[in-house]
Each structure stands twice: as C-alpha cells, then as structure tokens.
C-alpha cells in the first residue's frame, strides 16, 4: 500500500486513470523488492498535479524505503524539485553530473543545446 491504491486491487487496470496506472506500475515494481527502481518518463502524459503525486511516491520510495531511484525526466522543475543528483546527456555524451542544488540554467542550456523554454517546465505550454 506504498502508493495508496490497495482499494483498487480488484479493479481492471484498463479502467484506471494515467496516474493510477503509473502507481500500479510502481506497486508492481515494489512487489519484486528491488534494490534499484528505474522510471522512464513516469509523468510524461500526466497533468501537473498528478505528476507531482507520482514524483512524491518515487521520492518516498527512495527516502523511506532506501531504494535507489533513477528517473528519466524532461521537466526541469521536477528534476530540480525531486532529484538529488542530476545526470545530463546530450547526443549520447555526458555533459553534466552533479548535485541538483548546483545545476544552473546555463547547465540546462548545455544539456539541451538551446535556451530553456517555459515548455521545459511542467504545467507550461
């Protein structure tokens, strides 16, 4: 019940919202008792509020359960808000590896190879 969907145990997953489906995926991964949790763009198709809910669950898994959590994100504000360490790749090459508190807009511009836009932040178009 780490992701608060126990009451949905007997409901078809196809009837779930996108956020609930992500939580089911997280719960399924947790049932395997992993040492590392990999989440590839877990909030890509979610609204901003649900995105933060899912990211909070992933953060709790890391901080409360001690499971290393690696998350691939394209929303800069979520990376800064929920991450501890940021690894930036561009054209398959490492261009940033450091503490998220030390990352600057210039670092993000180097990662993306362009100026940062409002669409790089969740909830903005």
Region spans (language model):
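Helix N-cap at the start of a conserved alpha-helix in ABC-type nucleotide-binding domains
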Residues: 48-50
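Conserved catalytic motifs of ABC-family nucleotide-binding domains
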Residues: 33
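Conserved ABC ATPase "signature" region
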Residues: 1-7
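Catalytic Walker B motif of ABC-type/P-loop ATPase nucleotide-binding domains
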Residues: 37-40
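H-loop/switch region of ABC-family ATPase nucleotide-binding domains
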Residues: 73-74
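Conserved ABC ATPase signature
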Residues: 12-16, 20
């Amino acid at each position: 019940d780490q992701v608060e969907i126990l009451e949905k145990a007997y409901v078809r997953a196809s009837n779930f919202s996108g956020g609930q489906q992500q939580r089911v995926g997280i719960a399924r991964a947790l049932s395997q008792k992993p040492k590392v949790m990999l989440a590839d763009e877990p909030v890509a198709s979610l609204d901003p509020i649900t995105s933060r809910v899912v990211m909070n669950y992933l953060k709790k898994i890391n901080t409360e359960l001690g499971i290393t959590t690696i998350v691939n994100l394209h929303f800069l504000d979520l990376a800064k808000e929920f991450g501890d360490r940021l690894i930036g790749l561009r054209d398959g090459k490492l261009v940033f590896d450091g503490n998220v508190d030390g990352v600057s807009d210039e670092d993000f511009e180097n990662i993306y190879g362009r100026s940062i836009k409002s669409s790089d932040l969740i909830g903005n178009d």
